[in-house]
Amino acid sequence: MGAVIVHASAASLSLPDGEQWLAHAKQGLAPYWMMPSARGEPEGNFPTFRCDDGQLLDVKRVCAELNYGWITPHFGREYTRMKSRQTYAYGVLFHLTGDPEALKLARQGAKYLIEELQDKEHGGFISFTQEGKAGLEWQQRTSQDQAYALVGLAMLYYLTRDAQIESVLIQQQRFIFDKYRLPDGKGLAWVLEDGDEQSAKQRELVAQLDQINGYLLLVAPLLPEPHKSRWLEELNWLTHVMLSHYYSAEEQRFYGAIHHKAVMMQSAKHNDFGHTIKAYWITYLSGQKLGNAAWQTLARQGMQHTLQQAQYAPNWADIAPWVPPALQAKWKGQQVLSWRSRPGNNGISSWEWAELDQAAMTLALLDGNVPKVLYYTLPSYMQIWVDPRFGGVGLNPQSTKAFHWGNAYHQFEHALVGYLFSQQMSKKPVTLYYAMDKAQAEHLAPYYFNADVQQVESLLNAAGLPRIKVQFTSLKP
């Protein structure tokens, strides 16, 4: 890779280094997710709703950060997808730090998902439980929920190569693609029957996209044959579906849904920069895994365009109250750059911010050119979005951290990609932890990226599993 190009105007600024990313994960994010209240009863049954201070939701005295009209109707439901996303986060925390407690929690989360939340009668996973009972008829569960039930299991399989988890992943992937595949071949259905305000007529981007980032992309290269080849074929098909039916070359964006003209408008649900950048990122990574150079080129150009559209310079007076003194001293008098959700809408949620950062970091790894925006958005994520008192990142800066759509998933993926990015840009080795022995240490790669394995070191067992510490060099997306 060529020399790192730093914009002259960013010369006085600095990017977080690898140690800062590890500190961010351990001291910025982990405190909120390692609290006793986060661990569930029994441990592994991670609660969907928690207040900003970590307390469990009390429906008789609802904390302000959860007291929104779009959240309160879901109280009483415990969502499988959120338990799986939290399992993923503990897996990443172990991956970055080797923390045995994080590994134990990831294993407990996986155990609960497998033993308690699979639909033993109909197949697939239960979307949510209410008063201990499964919600919805099986045909009313979304294919997105079926995918996100696997995101934590996929991460733990990547870390452990556990045979039971492998079996569940293979079985669930087959269930989703057998049951939800549309007769016209244009992807996967959203739901099979109307219910819970969802319609079988819906054609949703995330029904396709979240199969890929939920499990296909991470797990497919690791599976034994014939499963590996079949999963890679499905990865190829779904990426093709996204580009053929959900992508507009003219508008250079992905449609959030395609079942009606109204749902394809830029102002409609899921037609934001977050979903488009994520779809481009996944298209690039799929193209890389499958050796499809045309997809990689399209995705790189699309990411570049979207990142330009998504950045803007906010008024200093609007952001100054949020900026901590250390950053104020660095940024005063400069044109600070930020991310936004849509054209003409400068609001943004933390998950969209994370996705935009991850795409920008990936492009920087590819061409050695760090865009100026990252010199602002990475420190902002660490120092403005993170709650300095209780830890964790919310939908809003420092608030609304655990609800039916938001928890630890995006913030920990962001920390992992950030660490990989900073180590490679500094030409330092990447150190990651896995829960397997040296004999199993095949097909090791740092998350979605490629790298050379420099060293594999055996460590003491943790949480009943062997551990290895792996050093990678020459990381490339």
PLM features per residue range, with description:
Residues 5-477:
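Glycan-recognition and catalytic cores of secretory/periplasmic carbohydrate-active enzymes
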